[in-house]
């Protein structure tokens, strides 16, 4: 992908913000080297890594990555046999500590069943060198200073050195306490010159202490003298310092030699930790943006839900739905230069670069974005400044370059296509450029203020119009993208709001050609209907949410009912069994007494009568009643398939299987509600046997109410479905083999609803969108059985 587009879409600013979430220079370096990938599998893996990082952040808040340092230069010096200083060795030790902590951290997550396979595999590559880490920890502190615990010899040298220094200070302090000190010394302090302890003596008393003069003050009035009495002690101290230095060098050389045996392992650990830092930075950035992991498409499909430009204030930016690649591959955003059109282009372009770089995007869940081989953008006139060309020449030079490189895996963003020249010629060029881009198979989003391009979205099957909503009350754009609605000029409305005379406005309107005026009136009407539809849609969503909540409550109550019923039945069984058992016991006693009487010679009592009596008592004991959720009657096993009609046993409702979630669960459409239902709670409903086909003699009369097409444009969803249902009956009675249902392109909501209804109609054999001559995807052709 070309670097130029990253600059145009300000991807560098995204990387700068992302770098703030890195914990190390290694993470920052990986971020600044980040570039959008074009291979679908690579992008998919990068997105999964970020999602796993986000899962870790959600579960643990952070990861033990702090303390990671770039030690690659240190390792290179070890490779050529050099020794490291204390700070460099400490930094390697710190990386080894982070490696161990990170591996333990990841193992803990994996042990509790957290699904992070990619990052789990990454942590498996970390090698724990605990002995090496501990050797460094007991030898060097975080400032790089060698600790006394580094060796017994160093500890002994330093103990002797401290005692020697104490003796020197003690001797010099005795001079400071002398009663003549105030007279002979410039100041009662011990200081150091040339790394030897000295005292400040006035010039005139320099011979009193003997010894060596190491320095003097600027005025020459004070001499810094090492008295003769401490010269030997200072010499001893210097010798000990030399031994200390020698031992430190030996320790550093020894540790460096030890580390040289683990260069490859330390190098790999550091690289892996850098990857972890990079991935976790992406996850933290996504959390800060309130971003989501998008679904990826390798067929050019884009469906962004409530997408936001990541560089704009999240509290103020207007979220927009942007969809492309299914019903149309070209969007032409028309309307006046009131702002918002270019932001839409940049939002789509920048979110595409982010997604292909493995970043989450600021949009709602279930958003889909395509993976392109190249993203091209002609936005702004930065070239004209560089090359001293006119705005038009600048844009045209860029467009020529784009058309030479573009293919079916490309996204092109044209801003103000055809601008900077004669409007009529500019509009014609814009149309030709859009057609050329489509022939190359590219996905295109273009903005323009030329009204001539409004027709482009209507007379090209691959294209649709769009606009940015403008509020004439506030005289400002709302920045709401309206796909399917072309832009219109608001000049007359704005002028009226600003106080221009009505007579002038009326005269101006008369000068506008009828076709343009009708088009603007049509667009205005479409906008009003769209706003109404959006309000009704939101109301319907609210009702659906309420119905869903009610259904859940009902399901809960039904479950409670059956549980309570089972409990009561069980209690009744136990009570009844107790009563009968008691009766049996009493009967046994009676029978025993009767048999005793029989043995004693009592007449009239037969043995078989005793047995019959006991059998009848045994049968009186009630059987256990097992009844919970109704179970499906035994029948030939049926393998459920999408589209099957079923009965939901726990609800007693009929529904249709939509798709299989797992072997144990299905998505079921019950009326207007879609629910997850367990397979064991489903009973298959056999389809009705087809009735014997009747031969229908079609008699067409001039006053027959049924026509060969039904126009639903402008209808509400519920009204439209009722009309379709009634119309199909009339068309069947009239004997039509096929009919056309016109629903328009629009947002696709009505088209989708009608299509779903037709798929489930018992008399519909097949459905398809119309050919270009029949109205394209604004018309559905229905063939009857």
From Swiss-Prot:
GO biological process, alphabetically ordered: mismatch repair; negative regulation of DNA recombination; rescue of stalled ribosome
GO molecular function: ATP binding; ATP hydrolysis activity; ATP-dependent DNA damage sensor activity; endonuclease activity; mismatched DNA binding; ribosomal large subunit binding; rRNA binding
Record bears the keyword tRNA-binding: no
Gene3D superfamilies: 3.30.1370.110, P-loop containing nucleotide triphosphate hydrolases
Domain spans labelled Smr: 710-785
SUPFAM superfamilies, A to Z: DNA repair protein MutS, domain III, P-loop containing nucleoside triphosphate hydrolases, SMR domain-like
Protein's name according to its UniProt entry: Endonuclease MutS2
Species of provenance: Listeria innocua serovar 6a (strain ATCC BAA-680 / CLIP 11262)
Taxonomic path: Bacteria, Bacillati, Bacillota, Bacilli, Bacillales
This protein's encoding gene: mutS2
